[in-house]
Regions:
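N-terminal, active-site-proximal structural segment of metallo-dependent hydrolase catalytic domains
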Residues: 1-44, 54-59, 75
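Structured beta-strand-rich core segments of catalytic domains in phosphoester-bond hydrolases
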Residues: 37, 42-94
Length: 94
């Protein structure tokens, strides 16, 4: 299994710079993105998409692209002061 973590520092700008081609080249099973800041549409038919965006538009946010469906998905820690920033997604696999 290949897992990649990428701080994209704004997914919309990263997408314009070839994000999708880079993801294809990496051939990762799971791609974890931080600081996505937006929910710009991604055409990734080979990946399931799990988004956790901040309540404040244009701020923080995370995205996980996964080739296999997880057993469970957790968004946040259950602490409102932290979860409003969209900083955590946990996927659980067997």
């Amino acid at each position: 299994m290949k897992l990649v973590s990428w701080n994209v520092n704004g997914l919309a700008a990263c997408k314009r710079k070839g994000f999708l081609k880079s993801i294809a080249r990496l051939r990762a099973d799971i791609v974890c993105c931080q600081e996505v800041r937006t929910n710009c549409p991604l055409n990734t038919p080979e990946y399931l998409q799990y988004w956790n965006l901040a309540e404040q538009s244009g701020y923080s946010g995370t995205l996980i692209l996964a080739k296999k469906e997880p057993r469970s998905v957790q968004y946040g820690l259950g602490i409102d002061q932290l979860d409003c920033e969209g900083r955590l997604i946990a996927l659980e696999y067997d």
